[in-house]
Amino acid sequence: MSKFSPRQVAVWLALSLSLASCVKGKAETPRNAADLTIHAASDEAVPEWKVMKFWDASGGEIWIEPTAALNLDDIQSAEESRDERGRTAIALRFTAAGAEKMRMFSSAHIGKKAAIVFDGKVMNAPTIMSAISSHAIISSGQSGLSADQAERILAIVNR
């Protein structure tokens, strides 16, 4: 894998939330810090970490640290955007505390994986290539987010 800029890593940290498995109307639920979390992750078993399956049909598994490094409370706002490939995405702005948490977490985990968990499912687990702080981009797979997925994410984050 080639080296990415901090912006690309943020995109890749992609909070790649394909919400196809979420029920319609999920955006109507109250904002809950447990809905979206970022965790340290590993392809290998780690004592006291839990194994989780990826949301998609791949059936892949990853080990995640039980305690989240960041959650919805660390996100200040979100707006529709485009990723570096022009796909539908969501631009996140972290709170001051969230930006500091992300900077510290990503700095300490360069070269390691971070799992993006939404409603108890692993959405993505990119490798952190450099420190990330105040902004990140949510994108998804090869085609980006659908309009419905983007709306749901915006509704949840901006509550």
Question: What kind of region is each of these model predictions?
Answer:
Residues 2-4, 22-159:
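Structural signature of multi-pass, alpha-helical inner-membrane proteins
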Residues 1-20:
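Sec-dependent bacterial lipoprotein signal peptides
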